[in-house]
UniProtKB/Swiss-Prot annotation:
Residues 200-235 form the UVR domain. This is UvrABC system protein C. It comes from Staphylococcus haemolyticus (strain JCSC1435). Transmembrane segments: none annotated. Interacts with UvrB in an incision complex.
Length: 596
């Protein structure tokens, strides 16, 4: 079956033309999982099935079972078609903006009686949008200010009587009174001017109201208007000035390094940089320019972004290609302050990539240092591959074990394994560990799989001795075995190693100790999760049902006393005894609850 689809793809590739167009990759269920475009379709499609790829492309190619292509007359047409196909199919491998970053906008709804709202959803034809705002607080504060000045309706549904907002002057009461549409139009114009940076009209309006209130000796109302004027001044001076004009514009910049591309977008509103967006893209088959054209098309067509008056992009890009997918004025500044903004966006993209690689390098450096330190302290070779085991059961019910693998100090989830205990009756941790280690390394030997440089067991000398006995006397293996002991707070406390399970001296703030902590937490999490899944499958309804000495009467009494399993977990042995449990049963219950 595998060779059938490969042969089919090979045959189809031989007839693909050397023309521009789009291609659709499909999986075994005939679902479109990737859409791309190319100047020469055959060359691009062949590249997927030859040579080495990064991890993401390798996963994609592994799922491809068929493909289709559509020939176009130009690269521009290919770009437009690609965006439409992505919108249509939403393929999971090439939605650049699938994290769906959304920003808050202020919206005046398109209704007979408009509302002023804050929203993260942009729907064309439903109203007038202003923004984006850097965060919800900023948008809400601005709306709150406008609500005090412009009495748009507040109710989602029109009530049959006047509400509180009418009585405090923040609504004109359209539920009862007729409101002239010209009044709404005038308010909308003034709000638009204000939110687009022209605050003179609204300030003059408020100053006139303040003077009028003062003349009428209504000093409390005059103070309110004075505070509103001050609030507007505070609101408009918070952002860094990036431009001397109030044109709404988005500024794009990008940088490419080590197979990654970062695209930065500056949102300039009222001459201010009010928000920044950064997107990291792994470069695959397309050039950096092609990736940019696809990105910017998706940015405005798929994501929650409104088109500004101008979009500024670097000079090296094809303006016509961008114009074909972005329906607004495209500017490529050559000099002056506007070019400096594009350069700044480019520089921010460069810095973001440098930071990304620096963090990766530091992480790799830390993990390598951790395993080197661990090897030195234990007196063994650097443990490149570590396999760790942990058991999980409740009083011997549904016993399971789990193994996690760490390579170069990092979790390798492909190496994780789960085991149901088959040969052990009752809660016997030592025998369970022996069984699992025997099964694991018998298979490793039979299948020629890589052996670990270090085995870690969650436990002490008894667990270590049992594992060593299986490895050395049954399987003939010489692999270092260490134990991890926990303190009374169930936290990693000590590393044990050697014939007498002696404590390995490790500083608690060392990278090696931090690595051991992560390994123990991860294997415990993996084992507990598997045990819970197993219990659910076997129909085990309550941890109380697993504890010897707790029947239906005691179970009812416990639930009546504590109200929930959560409260029982927080209870001490003394508390459990007060609920009528003998000390031994209380101890067993506490142990069972801590494992649940």
């Amino acid at each position: 079956m595998l060779s059938d689809y490969k042969e089919k793809i090979k045959n189809k590739l031989s007839v693909v033309p050397f023309e521009p167009g789009c291609y659709l990759m499909k999986d075994r269920n005939d679902q479109v999982i990737y859409v791309g475009k190319a100047k020469r379709l055959r060359n691009r499609l062949r590249s997927y099935f030859t040579g080495a790829h990064d991890a993401k492309t390798t996963r994609l190619v592994g799922e491809i079972r068929n493909f289709e292509f559509i020939v176009t007359s130009s690269e521009t047409e290919s770009l437009l078609l690609e965006l439409n196909l992505i919108k249509q199919y939403q393929p999971r491998y090439n939605i650049l903006l699938k994290d769906d970053k959304s920003y808050p906008f202020i919206k005046i709804t398109k209704e007979k009686h408009p509302k002023l709202i804050v929203t993260r959803t942009v729907k064309k034809g439903t109203g007038k949008y202003f923004g984006p705002y850097p965060n919800a607080y900023s948008a809400q504060e601005t709306k709150k200010l406008l609500d005090r000045i412009y009495p748009f309706r507040k109710c989602d549904k029109m009530p049959d009587k006047l509400c509180l907002y009418y009585h405090i002057g923040q609504c004109m009461g359209p539920c009862v009174y007729d409101v002239d549409q010209q009044v709404y139009a005038q308010m909308t114009r003034e709000i638009s001017d204000f939110l687009n940076g022209e605050d003179k009209t609204i300030l003059k309006n408020l100053e006139d109201r303040m003077m009028d209130a003062s003349e009428k000796l209504d000093f409390e109302r005059a103070k309110e208007y004075r505070d509103l004027i001050q609030h507007i001044h505070n609101l408009t001076k918070k952002q860094k000035i990036m431009s001397s004009d109030n044109t709404i514009r988005d500024v794009f910049g990008y940088n490419v390094s080590k197979g990654w591309m970062c695209i930065q977008v500056f949102f300039i509103r009222q001459g201010n940089l009010i928000q920044r967006d950064a997107t990291m893209i792994p470069l695959q088959q397309q050039s950096e320019e092609e990736e940019f054209y696809t990105f910017i098309g998706q940015f405005y067509s798929l994501n929650q972004h409104i088109l500004p008056k101008e979009v500024h992009v670097p000079k090296n890009l094809d303006k016509d290609m961008i114009q074909s997918v972005v329906d607004t004025k495209i500017v490529q500044p050559a000099r002056g302050a506007k070019k400096e903004m594009v350069d700044l966006a480019n520089h921010n993209a460069e810095v973001a990539l440098e930071n990304k690689f620096e963090l990766i390098a530091r992480d790799e450096s830390r993990t390598i240092k951790a395993i080197e330190e661990l090897g030195e302290r234990m007196g063994i070779q650097t443990p490149i591959r570590i396999e760790a085991f942990d058991n999980s059961n409740i009083q011997g019910v549904d016993p399971v074990s789990a193994m996690v693998t760490f390579v170069d100090g990092k979790a390798d989830k492909k190496g994780y394994r789960k085991y149901k205990i088959k040969t052990v009756d009752g809660p016997d941790d030592y025998k369970s560990m022996r069984e699992v280690v025997r099964r694991r390394y018998t298979r490793v030997l039979n299948e020629g799989l890589p052996l670990p440089d270090l085995i870690i067991v969650d436990g002490g000398k008894g667990h270590m001795s049992g594992v060593l006995d299986v490895l050395e006397n049954e399987l003939g293996l010489d692999i270092p075995v260490a134990g991890l002991r926990k303190n009374d707070k169930h936290q990693t406390s000590e590393l044990l190693y050697g014939p007498n399970a002696e404590v390995v001296p490790l500083k608690k703030n060392s990278q090696a100790f931090y690595l051991l902590h992560r390994i123990q937490d991860e294997v415990h999490r993996f084992a507990i999760t598997f045990h819970r899944q197993t219990r659910q499958k076997t129909g085990l309804q309550s941890v109380l049902d697993t504890v010897d000495g707790i029947g239906s009467k005691r179970k009812t009494s416990l639930l009546r006393t504590f109200g929930s399993i959560k409260k029982m977990k927080e209870a001490s042995v003394v508390d459990l005894k007060k609920a009528g449990l003998p000390e031994k049963v209380a101890l067993n219950l506490q142990q069972a609850l801590s494992n649940d």
